[in-house]
Swiss-Prot record:
This is Progonadoliberin-1. The modification Pyrrolidone carboxylic acid is found at residue 26. Keywords: Amidation, Cleavage on pair of basic residues, Hormone, Pyrrolidone carboxylic acid, Secreted, Signal. GO terms for cellular component: extracellular space. It is found in: Secreted. Residues 1-25 form the signal peptide. InterPro entries: GnRH, Gonadoliberin. The gene is gnrh1. GO terms for molecular function: hormone activity. The modification Glycine amide is found at residue 35.
Length: 95
């Protein structure tokens, strides 16, 4: 066999071994039993808790406690922040 072909076989074997080691692991997450079976009742309870926890998602300022402000000044501030890099010109990158 040519050296290039043997390197490809070694690489393929290494990839297969790594895939097998990842596939055989038990990945633990919330509500996953050691047997690999999920408890569906607890999953639905957690989704309900997540939805109840954030009731004011429509207005993010009320959740954070900041004062409501019109959208136009906020847009201009964001545009100025994002556009400030563009006004300077092209950046010079060192090689």
């Amino acid at each position: 066999m040519a050296p290039q072909t043997s390197n490809l076989w070694i690489l393929l074997l290494l990839v297969v071994v790594m895939m097998m080691s990842q596939g055989c692991c038990q990945h633990w997450s919330y509500g996953l039993s050691p047997g690999g079976k999920r408890d569906l009742d607890s999953l639905s309870d957690t989704l309900g808790n997540i939805i109840e926890r954030f009731p004011h998602v429509d207005s993010p300022c009320s959740v954070l406690g900041c004062v409501e402000e019109p959208h136009v000044p906020r847009m201009y501030r964001m545009k100025g922040f994002i556009g400030s890099e563009r006004d300077i010109g092209h950046r010079m990158y060192k090689k």
